[in-house]
A protein has these predicted regions:
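Extended, charge-enriched "interface" segments that sit outside catalytic cores
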Residues: 4, 12, 49-244, 260
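Active-site pocket-lining segments that scaffold enzyme catalytic pockets across diverse folds
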Residues: 225-285
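Hydrophobic alpha-helical scaffolding
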Residues: 14-17, 32, 89-92, 153-157, ...
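Subset of Sec-pathway N-terminal targeting signals
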Residues: 6-49, 55-56
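Cofactor-binding active-site loop characterized by glycine-rich and histidine/acidic residues
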Residues: 261-436
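Amphipathic alpha-helical packing elements
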Residues: 99-122, 251, 255-275, 366-369, ...
Length: 436
């Protein structure tokens, strides 16, 4: 991500000149966050100053500043004798440093500008560090060509205007991507390369687009039919979240293609009837009979239709896979740890227990669907996360989906719902990636 090529780590190089001190500090901070994001030569250089486990970062930064000050005399001497540095002009160009910092800001904070609220109920404040002025740039620089460094766009340099257009397209459209808090460098770099190389778009062929349209139409059609035929009957519809159905279907098909044999789904009320029909294949006639009161329980007093579980088998590219939708109690989120226990038991039964080194457990996949207010507000969510990386309870990873219809039970004002910007911020404690 640095504009300076580090050919040698010595005291006689102009990259350590005083006017680069702030750049080196920023580069070192970047190295501390993600070592793989800087050139390999810089990695080796920084490693010299942090080889001891007791090394203090402030001391290392002070060492860089000392080196920079020591270079001032050399720089003045070169100017007086007419000699020049071996590095190109942009090595010491503060504009280039500003461009790189702007790219990093988009990766860190571009999600703050993403268009996530179709109802426009919560206007978003201007993100200061995504402005040109914050990085000592101006509109006069827009047509200047700069090196793109590690920006994955297929070219080594581009005008600043084009760089900004690409970053806006990747990070600030209708999908917010927040991943810079992830501590695993390979995971972070994979996400960076994937979204930037695709310019923020997932490319589907015609067949896939038709399949998605079919799923969306089925999801929307069911909700409209139930609303019209059973007006006023409680059903916890999926209106506004219909894209959830093709998303879950894609997860199931992809997982099956990778060899997963069972998928266990846990969810609350909203969208449950749609999942029963359009994901697990429950006969719609059976659902309508439940609405009409024609179904009598064999034992006990029965339960409401949006608590019922179901299981079925579906075909995937990897063969037949078993789906199970767990029965749901009315207490929000309590199904999550129950689901994890069910998945772990199924993995043990298949002799496929996962370990903490990310091996095993691939035969059974847990999928948990949350509501936005419950995900942020129910303590059992954090408790389940806390157990997710322990030897006895890990399931090897869970797909979490949050359906946010912007109404948390009886509270619609975000300031009264939670203390964080996103309902998924609680997952940051466990270094999960977030896509909104």
């Amino acid at each position: 991500m640095n504009s300076i090529t580090k050919e040698k780590a010595g005291q006689g190089h102009t990259e350590l000149a005083a006017d680069n001190a702030s750049y080196i500090e920023a580069l070192y901070e970047q190295y501390l966050t993600d070592p793989d994001s800087v050139d390999t030569d810089w990695q080796a250089y920084f490693e010299q100053y942090k080889s001891s486990n007791d090394a203090q970062h402030n001391a290392i930064k002070d060492q860089f500043l000392l080196l920079a000050r020591n270079q001032t005399a050399n720089k003045s001497s070169n100017e007086s004798t007419g000699t020049s540095s071996s590095n190109s002009d942009n090595c010491t160009d503060p504009k280039q440093m500003g461009v790189q910092q702007l790219i990093s800001a988009y990766r860190r904070r571009g999600h703050r500008r993403a268009k996530l609220d179709p109802l426009n109920l919560h206007p978003r404040a201007e993100v200061e560090d995504l402005t040109l002025a914050y990085h000592n740039l101006s509109e006069a620089d827009l047509d200047t060509v700069f090196p793109t460094n590690d920006l994955v766009i297929g070219k080594d340099e581009a005008p600043l205007r084009e760089i900004i257009e690409i970053m806006e397209r990747v990070y600030c459209r209708h999908i917010g991507i927040e991943y810079m808090h992830v501590t695993t460098s390979t995971e972070k770099r994979w996400m960076e390369e994937y979204v930037e190389s695709n310019l923020g778009y997932i490319k589907f062929d015609k067949e896939k687009r038709l399949s998605i349209l079919e799923r969306l139409t089925a999801a929307e059609g069911l909700e409209k039919y139930l609303a019209r035929k059973y007006t006023g009957v409680k059903r916890f519809g999926l209106e506004g979240g219909e894209s959830f159905i093709p998303a879950v279907n894609e997860i199931i098909q992809r997982a099956g293609g990778y060899g997963t044999k069972e998928m266990v789904i846990g969810m609350a009320h909203r969208g449950r009837l749609n999942v029963l029909v359009n994901i697990l294949g429950k006969n719609p006639a059976d659902l309508f009979d439940e609405f009409d009161g024609k179904v009598q329980p064999e034992k006990g007093s029965g339960d409401v239709k949006y608590h019922n579980g179901f299981s079925s088998n579906v075909m995937t590219p990897g063969g037949e896979a078993h789906l199970a939708l767990a029965f749901n109690p009315s207490h929000l989120e309590i199904v999550a740890p129950v689901l994890q226990g069910s998945v772990r038991a199924r993995q043990v039964r298949r002799n496929d227990q996962p370990s903490l080194d990310n091996t095993g457990g691939n035969s059974v996949l847990p999928i948990v669907i949350h509501g936005d207010a419950a995900f942020a507000g129910q303590g059992v969510v954090q408790e389940t996360f806390q157990m997710s990386q322990t030897r006895a309870y890990t399931t090897g990873g869970t797909v979490h989906i949050v359906i946010n219809n912007q109404v948390g039970f009886t509270t619609s004002r975000q300031e009264d719902v939670r203390s964080t910007e996103y309902c998924t911020d609680v997952a940051k404690w466990y270094m999960h990636q977030s896509y909104t």
